[in-house]
Amino acid sequence: MALRSDYEHGRADSYRVATVIATDDDNRTADGQYKSRRKMPAKVNKKENLDDLKQELDIDFHKISPEELYQRFQTHPENGLSHAKAKENLERDGPNALTPPKQTPEWVKFCKNLFGGFAMLLWIGAILCFVAYSIQASTSEEPADDNLYLGIVLSAVVIVTGIFSYYQESKSSKIMESFKNMVPQFATVIREGEKLTLRAEDLVLGDVVEVKFGDRIPADIRIIEARNFKVDNSSLTGESEPQSRGAEFTHENPLETKNLAFFSTNAVEGTAKGVVISCGDHTVMGRIAGLASGLDTGETPIAKEIHHFIHLITGVAVFLGVTFFVIAFILGYHWLDAVIFLIGIIVANVPEGLLATVTVCLTLTAKRMASKNCLVKNLEAVETLGSTSTICSDKTGTLTQNRMTVAHMWFDNQIIEADTTEDQSGVQYDRTSPGFKALSRIATLCNRAEFKGGQDGVPILKKEVSGDASEAALLKCMELALGDVMNIRKRNKKIAEVPFNSTNKYQVSIHETEDTNDPRYLLVMKGAPERILERCSTIFINGKEKVLDEEMKEAFNNAYMELGGLGERVLGFCDFMLPSDKYPNGFKFNTDDINFPIDNLRFVGLMSMIDPPRAAVPDAVAKCRSAGIKVIMVTGDHPITAKAIAKSVGIISEGNETVEDIAQRLNIPVSEVNPREAKAAVVHGAELRDVSSDQLDEILRYHTEIVFARTSPQQKLIIVEGCQRMGAIVAVTGDGVNDSPALKKADIGVAMGIAGSDVSKQAADMILLDDNFASIVTGVEEGRLIFDNLKKSIAYTLTSNIPEISPFLAFILCDIPLPLGTVTILCIDLGTDMVPAISLAYEHAEADIMKRPPRDPFNDKLVNSRLISMAYGQIGMIQAAAGFFVYFVIMAENGFLPKKLFGIRKMWDSKAVNDLTDSYGQEWTYRDRKTLEYTCHTAFFISIVVVQWADLIICKTRRNSIFQQGMRNWALNFGLVFETVLAAFLSYCPGMEKGLRMYPLKLVWWFPAIPFALAIFIYDETRRFYLRRNPGGWLEQETYY
């Protein structure tokens, strides 16, 4: 079994691989240099370019000898390039800078918002209004202003909605700007033997550069000289532990070898000299930037739904408008009347306030999510998260606490579990045994980590530490167990130290002890367990020193295997009291030419560390599973560690085996196991390199629980694309620059607010402010709820379309005076219906929405045929009946019985007729008739408001009874009051008869619509009763939207 220890592997293989991209041979000149970017064809096939970027890096600059390197780049280690050669290279390759992607001009984006979707229909309506008004103005002495006002209102609606949408869109996509912030400004270069400070963008291939502590690496360089040089690759890899760099070639993989340093990473220690091997877009960082900014993300699920809905409604509006325009013509109407009628049909069909309602609903949910640590950058992402069917989660910091913690100890021949919980509420162990005291003394003294200053009130686990992650874990563990570690170190003064190095794989220090009766020096050592064990001849067990025999070695091996198998990083500890006769007080210890014993020591025990899971994660993963969401771990960490964490958080559930587990259980080779028998899979990045997209699809299809370990960022991107090929809606979490391509490609990218790089935050749609996976689950719940509530909101809004359209149809087909005007329709769509529709966004979930599978984007539409059938064919019809009932009542009260109204329209609308007789023989002037008509418009409008009360209440729930759901939504209760008050204001406010042609109504005219409102309530309550009684039955298939 591959065991891991800090010391055994060094750091090179245990940090996450950075994103890199292949450079095929046809992309280079004969001497291995890159071809000029300037001479590339004007149009590069974008898909081929991106496919090239997705390949792993394939270069040999780190393998060749320094002499071959200088020859290839025509440079010299001491003199650098000549000025002429540098100028030639600069002209050939262009500047050492990232090329920004082509942007869509802002005015084009603005025009798309101003003329897309419903907007085009409303513009046509507005233009028709202005045309009709101008014709009326030229043919009539006193033209009516209705069409002018209507045209102005429609134009205003379109412009305001367009500006609103444009503002929302313009806030996103600034990925490239955040990459630019990472680019260093200046670099120290040697040219013709002279040191120069140049702008970083003037560097060229073959330049010899010098970097020191605090600098940013100005290009990808091959290191030729180094002194204690360390770099922080976290901007590329997300792993912040410093990596040592030097001139030696140590690894085939260019990202893991010590002799390469990469553009935009930080030098944190020492100095180095190197030769520039890649510039600008060809650097590792440049390629990530190219990949992240070049990926086409496509539409969000909710945007697709809204476009589908817009096409549906637009189709209905155009079909009805044109059909009845033609019918009006055939029936002999004047073409101008037919145009006015066409405007009415369009205005009545288009829910003008709906896009604003959707945006406001999403904004409200985004605010609610922000209070739960989910900051949404792109509003449409709110719903996307609810549709998510697969989450590809990073491990470090998202599933885990992002701090190495001591998990187990082995002393006195037993494994002791340490407390890894965030609040120290876990297991306790005996801290009084001699074995623990000896082990804790070594861990305290043989440790260079220290707490940073000025953290007095901060809990121990939250304190910042200067030092290596493993040593920081030991320091915090000892501080919790023993108290003030710094004080213990003062009392046991350090005399000499041999720091850890990758050759010896141990660290030794010698101390004076606090025991005044014992003048001897204490030697303490820690390091890779097997290296420590081979330097020991005795072992300390239960307070006694015993000979380290084969039995004890086997016990050690078993413990080491067990802890290593848990994916933990294991360290061994030993000590030795130096005899005072050989090493008297004041002895000069020489750490270069060692003059003290480092063999025949006393072995004391092991300590193992892991970055433990966050407390809330197992529960969150279980919630995802019950919600039908597949959680895949994608990490750059070691497979054993990844599998251990996956098991502890439930990504690999208990009892589910991988191919390797089955082979081990049956004691057969792995090749003999049928992969489909294994529900779980741990896939190594190296295997992924050789896997075709079909094989990847098979892994994703047949394994329900998957861990991808040791993956590079392109592989993360390829995994995301694989999931999307399977039809999944994919959420991806990440924090490093290297994660940005996958974050951008995913349906929803989730970046980390605390540990995340600026680039990952720009590429993402959502930011977790607390870096906690559990917050994603909250987001999923909110996303599902908003989809349900948007359906309710749209059902409510669309229902009033029927009572708005039917008056125009009756006007044409039955030849009656117009029952409802176009301006009045706008008062409903942009006035009384807006607040109630938005209030449905506050509605609570009907049942446990996290117990159902994710929404199928192909079949479960925001607006489906069942919703249209309910809104238009059932509830809308009852509402239209209410409106016509009120219309006929008022007409009859004023002398026009229903029979008299049919066929009267031409006479009614003629200004020349001032003696039209009603059913009782009274004569009506044109002005009196119009006053009565506008009073009917107002009454029809009020009747729609009254039946919309019932519609709002029934839209609260799609399955539950209203009595079960209750009226706890105070926003909705306010909406009921608001629409009533607004309707009354529009009817009774002085001056409205001139502005909106709305007249005061008798109080009794509010009542005829109430029985219809009750009918709607009773009808729908009965429908839902039968829905609950017969789940999946005919009624559900026909009416459950």
Curated annotation (Swiss-Prot):
GO MF assignments? ATP binding; ATP hydrolysis activity; P-type sodium:potassium-exchanging transporter activity
Q: Which residues bind ATP?
A: 526
Q: Which reaction does it catalyse?
A: K(+)(out) + Na(+)(in) + ATP + H2O = K(+)(in) + Na(+)(out) + ADP + phosphate + H(+)
Location in or out of the cell: Cell membrane
Instruction: Check the record and name the CDD domains matching this protein.
Output: P-type_ATPase_Na-K_like (cd02608)
What SUPFAM superfamilies does the entry give? Calcium ATPase, transduction domain A, Calcium ATPase, transmembrane domain M, HAD-like, Metal cation-transporting ATPase, ATP-binding domain N
Pfam families on file: Cation_ATPase, Cation_ATPase_C, Cation_ATPase_N, E1-E2_ATPase, Hydrolase
Membrane-related topology note? Multi-pass membrane protein
E.C. number(s) listed in UniProt = 7.2.2.13
Query: What highest taxon heads this organism's lineage?
Result: Eukaryota
Q: Where are the transmembrane segments?
A: 115-135, 147-167, 312-332, 338-358, 808-828, 870-890, 935-955, 970-990
Example of a GO cellular component annotation carried by this entry: plasma membrane
Which SMART domains does this entry report, sorted A to Z? Cation_ATPase_N
Annotated tissue distribution:
High levels are found in some adult tissues: Malpighian tubules, indirect flight muscles, tubular leg muscles and throughout the nervous system (brain, optic lobes, retina and ventral thoracic neuromere). Lower levels are detected at the posterior end where the reproductive organs and rectum are located.
Where is the signal peptide, in residue numbers? none
State the InterPro entries in the record: ATPase_P-typ_cation-transptr_C (IPR006068), ATPase_P-typ_cation-transptr_N (IPR004014), ATPase_P-typ_cyto_dom_N (IPR023299), ATPase_P-typ_P_site (IPR018303), ATPase_P-typ_TM_dom_sf (IPR023298), ATPase_P-typ_transduc_dom_A_sf (IPR008250), Cation_transp_ATPase_P-type (IPR050510), HAD-like_sf (IPR036412)
Q: Which UniProt keywords apply?
A: ATP-binding, Cell membrane, Ion transport, Membrane, Nucleotide-binding, Phosphoprotein, Potassium, Potassium transport, Sodium, Sodium transport, Sodium/potassium transport, Translocase, Transmembrane, Transmembrane helix, Transport
Q: Which GO terms describe its biological process?
A: adult locomotory behavior; chemical synaptic transmission; determination of adult lifespan; intracellular potassium ion homeostasis; intracellular sodium ion homeostasis; jump response; locomotory behavior; monoatomic cation transport
Concerning PROSITE patterns, the annotation shows: ATPASE_E1_E2
Q: What does this protein do?
A: This is the catalytic component of the active enzyme, which catalyzes the hydrolysis of ATP coupled with the exchange of sodium and potassium ions across the plasma membrane. This action creates the electrochemical gradient of sodium and potassium ions, providing the energy for active transport of various nutrients.
Quaternary arrangement and interactors, per the entry?
A: The sodium/potassium-transporting ATPase is composed of a catalytic alpha subunit, an auxiliary non-catalytic beta subunit and an additional regulatory subunit.
Q: What additional remark is attached to this entry?
A: Ouabain-sensitive electrogenic ion pump.
What protein am I looking at?
Sodium/potassium-transporting ATPase subunit alpha
- Lineage in the entry? Eukaryota, Metazoa, Ecdysozoa, Arthropoda, Hexapoda
